[in-house]
Each structure stands twice: as C-alpha cells, then as structure tokens.
C-alpha cells in the first residue's frame, strides 16, 4: 500500500502542477482528450511526439495503449505542458478510456480507490512541488523508484492509481505490474496494456526510458534534466529488474507493494533466493535476468564434501575439532579414535545399523562398518529363522506321532463303532466342540452328532488326521510339554499321552444321560485339562464325579473312551492327560488307578461292551499310563488317529506300551479287558505305533507280557508291575 501514498503524493504533485498552471479539473481533461486526439499545445505536441515515437517504436506502444487507459496520463502530461487536470475521476477515466473494456470493471475499483486517495492527497497539494523534487532526488540517489517518482509523478496526474501504478510499474517494475496486474484496477489497465502487442520487456525498458524520459521532460518543466537522468538510470536498472518481475509477474506482490523500494526488493530478493528454497525457486524463475541469475548461482550452497574421504553423501555431516567438515563415518572415526579415518575404510555403501540384529553381534563387528555388518545381520537373520524351523520340526514330529497313534486307535474304534469313531473324529474339532455348558446341556446321543458337527461327520480317518493336525498344533505343543512331564513315567507314556484317548460316556453305554454325563465329564475334563488339568484333584474330581461307576477319573476317562457310545469321545485340547497334566496328578491317578482297578471290574463290564470302542480307548490304558497326561491326550489321539492306532488298541497288551499309569489302568481294567485285551491284542498286533514301542521299551519285558496277555493272569501281573513302576516313578 505504499504505492497508494506514493500515488497520492504523485497525484498531489500532479495536482500541484495543475494548481500551478491554474487549470481546472475539467480543462485538463478536455485538453487531455484533445491531446489524445490531437496535440493542442506545444507541450501537448511534445507528448504526442513522445506517444508517436512510442507508437512508432512499437516498444512503447504498450505504454501508450495503456495510456488510452492512461489518457489521464496524457492529461497528466498536459498539466506540465498545458494546464493539467487537478484530478481525474474514474468517470472521466471512463470517458477518456472508452476503448478499454477492462477499465469499466476496474473503474469501479478506481472509483473507490482513486477517489479516496485524491481526497487525501488534496490536502497535501501545497507540498507537491517540494515532494516532486524530493521524489526525483531520492529516486536519483537510491535508484529506488526513479521511474516511480518520475513516471508516477507524470503519469499519475489524473488517477493516482491508474496512471500512477502502471507508470511506476513501468519505471520501476518495468511492465511487471502491467503484466502481473498486481492491482485489480491496474490489472485492467495493465491487461489492456498487456493486450497490446508491444509489451516486450526490452521494448518496454527502452520505450520506458523514452516514455518516462518524455514524461519527465514533459512533466518536469522545472527539473527535466534531473528527471531525464533519473529516468535513464531507472530505465537501466529497470531493464534488469523488469525481466525478473515480468517473469515473476504472478509473484510481484513484493515489488508492487513498495514502488519506491521495488528496486531494493529486487536486490533483497537475490540473497533471499539463495537462502530460502521458495525464494530460490522464485529466483530460478527470475533467472532470466542476469542480475538475479548471478546471485542465485553464486548463492547456491556449494556441495558439501567430506574433508577426509571427499564424499558428498552422508546421513549426517560432522565437524572435526579443527572445524573441517567431515562425513558421518569420518567424524565418528575421528571422535572415537582421534585420528582421521583411513581412506581404505571408505565404501560406497552407507551402512545402517539394525539395533535388534546388531545387539547380538560383537563390538568388533560393529566397529567394522564394512562388509562384516551385513554379514552379521544375515547370520542373525539365519539364526532367528533357524529357531522357528526347529520348533516347526518339533511340532511336525509331534503331529506325526499323534497322527500315527490316532490312526491305529481310530482303526480299532472303527472296528468297534465306526459311528463313534466318526463322531470322535469330527468331535475332535475344538471349534465344533460346544462350550462345556452346551456340552452338558446336550444329550450325547444327539450331542454326538451335534458335537461332532456336520464337518465332523464328513471327516474320514485321513481327513480327521489332517483336521486334527490343523486343530491340535497348539495342543501338540501342550502335549509335548505334557509328554516331557510324563517322560518320567516312560517314553511309552509320552506316546500314550500323545495318543488320543477319547472320553467315553458313562459306563452304561445305553443311557443317553450317562452319555451326556460323560460328555459333560469330557468337556469338564477338557476344560480342566485346558485350564486346571494340571491340578490332580480338579480333573480327577471331575472325572470321578462326572464319569463313573469306576472311581478313578482315569477309568472314567477310559470308560468314556471305551464307551464312546456314540463316538462320545470328547475332543480335549490337552489330549495328553485327561485327569491332569501334573505328575502330582499321577500319584492321585495311581490311587485312582487302584480304585479304578477295583472299579474297573465294574466298569470293565462296561468296557467289555465298550472294548471295541475301548480299543480306541486303549487310551484308557493310555489314560492310566499318563493318567495325568494320557486321558486328555488319548482323547485327542483317538480323535486324531484312526481306530487302528495301537495306543487305543492296546488295552492290557499295550499297557506295557502305554504309560505305566495307563497300563495300570488297563491292568485294573484287565479283568474287564481280558476280552478287550484279546481284542486289543488283536488290535495291537494289527497296528503298532512307535509310541507303543516306546511304551514297550519303557515297560521293558512287560511289553511282551502285555502283548501276550490274552490271559488275565498275565495282565494282572503286568498291572501290578506297572503300578509298582508308577509308584516308583512318583
């Protein structure tokens, strides 16, 4: 807005000239019109000559044609040569510049702007003469806005805004304002100027020199020579300045804001362009002007180079104690070792440290920022990858073991009850397993089908194995843990724990309620096994209370397994131990085994009927073996493995194979299992799993006895031995 006061001052100057000449506002307007049309006075002739020269020159034509907008400019010139108008209103501007279409729109703005400023200016008209000289002098001295002072003073007579702004813009900014149309009111006039073909910067600079020169000449009757000198200087400066502003036409706000300081701002813009990115880009746009190009080029930050290794690229620039610029590597080396980093250590690759991987690495590796770092990183990666691979192998092995045993168990169970096995297979799905509450609520006759779920019914032994492997992988881990705990018992107990022992319904195979109860028991066992299976009391309590005539939870599990009335086997996530996971449970299980052995006689009748199921429920023996572990796991294994899996098929004969607890359970059940043992022996002979062999190995010669135990006496002896062994293990 400095332009406005300047314009007002210039306008005042114009008014002062007008006042000095004593012309009325209307007279200069008329004279201006007549001048624009024809030269009335000698001064007017000079103006017309100037205009004619501009028009003929073509360089100044834009100014002149802007002047049709600037007809007030002609009026403004007239006051110097002939009486000039004190002030030209926008209405007069409209009259004087009917040719400009843009002016009409801008005139409304001019009305507000021009009218308001002339009012302010009118008060200072008395000072105009002094101000004009001061303006010329200041411009002359500082080369600030000579064209502004001269051009604006001359041009701005009628309208401080219309004539003044384009004028000083021509002078200081060149045609920047006319092109950029910084001010909307000027934008119209400047647009009209822009519309003129002769607006070229060079032509403007030259024409400007002529234009302003003529204007000064015409205007400054008092100080024409100074004005001419000023204009020449201004033109020379403006010729340089104009180009950037013309190219910066969109960003001319700075220059336009201060007409007097426009040149100064140009000089300021040069360093700014070097410093700030935006200004630098701006300077690049301005770069056409030599003045801006040179400073911008000079001001570009020189590429920073490491004093030591001469590199240009580093994540962080450092400084040596001497103040030399160093790259990050050299700076750190200097800081740590106090010497310059040898160039032999220089590498083209900037190495980044990965804290997690590097933490495992030794300091020397860290010190070596070179290939060792990536190598160490790769090694750490490989090591980290190796661990999961091992765990995967373990889980796969567990899966394979569980698969093998369940297959045999399922096969035996299939021989007994394919439906039950199918139910168990499907039922093994934990996803399909309803919550214990639901399980309890469901009757097992219906719940067997429901519990198994549609997908379970569809599962065959092969699919079941896949399904079990998919569902049980977390369980295998648990089972592996259990097996590790049960490893005290024997490897066979591990295998038996891995072998799925389906939890069968209550000993009465006929009662759906007992089945439901067994299912509830199984669910409770499953839940207990999952949650508190380790607690000896909890799982046995649930088992004993829930399941059976037989007191021992293991037998109950076994019975439920053996019964599996409608494939009641309730899948347990922790199949390794139905009763509990802890070895302490084994002690309880031993007691329960004795009880079960007693109860087994009772339950054995059930199991005899269920033996075929119980063949799968070798898991019963498995449960007895790993009573802590087996009961759940055998259920799992039964679900996982086909009926044939020997763990299920070995009631007493496999007892040696199974954990001692399971064997004891089998022995206790041996009376009932004698037939079952025969059947189981058949099954065991039919299918032997590595688990059984492990159990046999653990059991020692008992395995052969158990395998040969088609007679109850052998079974009973094996049972006693197993019980002793379990006691010893406990």
From Swiss-Prot:
Protein name: Nitrogen regulatory protein GLN3
Motif range (9aaTAD): 129-137
Origin organism lineage: Eukaryota, Fungi, Dikarya, Ascomycota, Saccharomycotina
Listed InterPro entries: Transcription_factor_GATA (IPR039355), Znf_GATA (IPR000679), Znf_NHR/GATA (IPR013088)
Pfam families listed in its UniProt record: GATA (PF00320)
Compositional bias of kind Polar residues: 33-43, 252-262
Sequence ranges of Low complexity compositional bias: 224-240, 370-384, 449-470, 482-499, 596-631, 641-651, 658-672
Protein's organism: Saccharomyces cerevisiae (strain ATCC 204508 / S288c) (Baker's yeast)
SMART domains from the UniProt entry: ZnF_GATA
Keyword presence, Translocase: no
Phosphoserine: residues carrying this PTM: 251, 267, 285, 469, 552, 562
Keywords noted in UniProt: Activator, DNA-binding, Metal-binding, Nitrate assimilation, Nucleus, Phosphoprotein, Transcription, Transcription regulation, Zinc, Zinc-finger
Domain notes: The 9aaTAD motif is a transactivation domain present in a large number of yeast and animal transcription factors.
One GO MF term attached to the UniProt entry: DNA-binding transcription factor activity, RNA polymerase II-specific
Additional remark text: Present with 589 molecules/cell in log phase SD medium.
Disulfide linkage: none
Keyword NADP annotated: no
